UniProtKB/Swiss-Prot annotation:
Catalytic site positions: K204, C258
E.C. designation(s): 1.1.1.336
Binding site for NAD(+): Y10, I11, D30, T85, T119, K261, R326
Record PANTHER family: UDP-N-ACETYL-D-MANNOSAMINE DEHYDROGENASE
Protein name: UDP-N-acetyl-D-mannosamine dehydrogenase
Length: 418
């Protein structure tokens, strides 16, 4: 059996590697020639534990080949689509998915299995199956099969979670779901649940919308904590001792490819407006601006004009331990303050193009803003770092610092007690 994986990003490349490691012949396809060149050299274009070692192994065995040529996909029995589905405003942009479906239609044979892993609005898999029927003259469930198997992994833990997380597979036809289950069972040790395609689409979107709404509630608690002079993290810890309470963690914002986008995908085909989900999005989207307000307040307390201030932002990724900056609240924060301050410096140990070291980025700075919860930031001696700063201000957007360092003006999201 030959598997083609279309889209070699944060999900597509690890997925291709997993199937190749399971003994399948895999061809990975991406329209970005520079990505293909890098992968062929044995180096992944994304940061993920173990990915380079695993990539080199399957390349050396000849189980994975990558290409930007559509004709190289011919002869594949399975097509797994892992392309992005971004937003255009608040509406889904399915152009990448439709382009991938048209590519599959050019090369697929009878009996092919087409799996969409991309996160999509409810009803999209059915629409793509109809598009394939129109393009090929074949019938889903008879001549080819279409299923939705949404990814459910976290950057930094992708390979482990691909194996051990449970999997939801929805088929346009029952046979499509069964064929996809058999395929994923080659490496998935978690449970696999079968359903129809639209239910599978909704499950993935519900999961991320649940998280987004609950983070918004935690962020609203953090905003209230400032008004009441309370440490929201202490309050949350105590509230969570109740057996039926599990409050999420607030912070500078919600990022990544999924959480800021998926609530809008869930609502995109709805026939009426659902206010709670949209309000939660607005709360999470305002958090970078709230963090900027904390910074300007601290600068004022230190008698520093924003136009004369040098700001060192620690972390650009949307979460700790990854280089993924998609929809990162750190980037939104930088955008908000950039035109109001003298200079914005950035340092992220995982993201290329930032300062070389923490020590260099803070030298002569007036304020530090912690925007990402990288593990490297949790063991920093802030008093020592402060010796090279012009002024000592820290804004903690990720609750990295439990006790404000001596000699600093300290502000933190949800830290109404300081």
């Amino acid at each position: 059996m030959r598997i083609a994986v279309l889209g070699l990003g944060y999900i597509g490349l690890p997925t291709a590697i997993m199937f190749a490691s399971s003994g399948y012949d895999v061809v990975g396809y991406d329209i970005r020639s520079e990505v293909i060149k890098k992968i062929n050299s044995g180096v992944a274009h994304i940061i993920e534990p173990e990915i380079d070692r695993r990539l080199k192994e399957v390349l050396s065995l000849g189980k994975l080949k990558v290409t930007d040529r559509v004709e190289d996909l011919k002869g594949s029995n399975v097509f797994i689509i892992c392309v992005q589905t971004p937003l255009s405003g608040d509406d889904p942009d399915l152009s990448y998915l439709e382009r991938a479906i048209r590519t599959v239609a050019e090369v697929m044979d009878r009996g092919a299995l087409v799996i969409i892993e991309s996160t999509i609005p409810p009803g999209t898999t059915e629409k793509m199956a109809r598009l394939l029927e129109n393009l090929t003259g074949l019938r889903e469930g008879v001549d080819f099969y279409v299923a939705h198997a949404p990814e459910r992994v976290m950057p930094g833990r992708i390979f482990k979670e691909l194996v051990y997380n449970s999997r939801i597979i929805g088929g346009v036809s029952e046979k499509a779901a069964n064929l996809a289950e058999k395929l994923y069972r080659s490496f998935v040790k978690g449970r696999i649940f079968l359903t129809n395609a639209t239910t599978a689409e909704m499950v993935k979107l519900m999961e991320n919308t649940f998280r987004d709404v609950n983070i918004a509630l935690a962020n609203e608690f953090a905003l209230l904590a400032h008004q009441y002079g309370v440490n929201v993290y202490e309050a949350i810890e105590l509230a969570n001792t109740h057996p039926r309470v599990k409050i999420h963690t607030p912070g500078i914002g919600v990022g990544g490819h999924c959480l800021p986008k998926d609530p809008y995908l869930l609502l995109s085909n709805a026939k009426e407006d659902f206010g709670l989900i949209r309000i939660a999005r607005r709360i999470n989207e305002r958090m970078p601006a709230f963090a900027a307000g904390l910074l300007f307040e601290a600068l004022e307390k230190a008698n520093i004009k924003p136009s004369e201030a040098i700001i060192a932002v620690l972390g650009l990724a949307y979460k700790g331990g990854t280089d993924d900056t998609r929809n990162s609240p750190a980037l939104k924060f930088v955008e908000i303050i950039r035109n109001s301050v003298k200079e914005v410096r950035t340092y992220d140990p995982y993201v290329r193009g930032t300062h070389d070291s923490l020590e260099k980025v803070v030298e002569g700075a007036d304020a530090i803003v912690i925007a990402t919860d990288h593990p490297e930031f949790k063991s920093v001696n802030w008093e020592s770092i402060g010796k090279s700063m012009r002024h000592k201000i820290i804004i903690d957007g990720r609750n990295i610092i439990k006790e404000p360092p001596v000699g600093f003006i300290f502000r933190g999201i949800g830290r109404g007690d300081v």
